[in-house]
Amino acid sequence: MTHILLPLSLMSATILAGVGIFLLITLLLVAILLVAKRYLVHSGNVEININSQRTVEAPSGGSLLGTMAACDIFLPSACGGKGSCGQCRVQVLDGGGEVLPTETVHLSRRQIADHWRLACQVKVRQNLDIHVDQSALDVKEWECTVISNRNVATFIKEFIVQLPAGEHMNFRPGSYAQIKIPPFSIDYDRDIDKSLIGPEYLPAWEKFGLFSLKCVNTETTVRAYSMANYPDEGDRIMLTVRIATPPFKPKPAVGFQDVNPGIASSYIFSLKPGDKVLMSGPYGDFHVDTDSKAEICLLYTSPSPRDS
């Protein structure tokens, strides 16, 4: 058998040639993508016509939900814009593109025919003509101050924030607010004030090992909670929030499973009087018709809608 040995210099030249060809192909593909992006993807600002009454200019590329929030128009989005709650509905009359499969599970055929879309799933790529409910235009966002955050049950907080001076949120029973949750890393033992839990509830927390929990949130999101105070107290917002712990490990193991606790409840339980938090509202259209004489039966799942 004959073995052909290539000179070392020839082998090095072959390797260098291969690397050079690979880099050349990579650069060529990058150049093609950049050219395609320049001519096929809209860049710069676009105009959004809202209810044929107002036109705003906004950068392209983001979701319609985020773009509207940047323009101080806050649409309901209990899931934080992930497309799972189906609440951020708007009519996109022009410029929204095709309805996505993630939207069809939340919209009926009639709604799709009437141009309803989920704002979190619509990308702002060109000028848009949209229609939103008037109630959405009345929603405001405030930097509120925590004035109380005490436990009223073993795992439930009464969370109260004060709106800025002179501000008032006009809400009705059944309305809800949204709280903006920033990225964080929370150690329950370090970051939750045990004095705000109270001596009567601390033994249960220690028994079940809640102070061993940790929670990490990597992106800004929002969560929705019903108001638990009376509408006349519109200069403050009261929420009742239950801590959302991970499920327990299957017996005979003890302790919690290695998953994140609730992001919003962990954040709220870590807040202390004097802390600042972003709240928006009021949202919701499920209200009692007080002018009706018809008998109604109300079922509720927590004290919040009852108390408000």
Task: Name each model-derived stretch.
Residues V46-G62:
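Membrane-cytosol interface motif
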Residues T67-P76, Q87-L137:
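Iron-sulfur (Fe-S) cluster-binding segments and ferredoxin-like electron-carrier domains
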Residues P282-A294:
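A short, basic/flexible loop-to-alpha-helix module at the beginning of a structural domain
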Residues A31-I48:
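Transmembrane-cytosolic junction motif
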Residues M1-S12:
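Short, strongly hydrophobic alpha-helical membrane anchors
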Residues I147-P273:
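Ferredoxin-reductase
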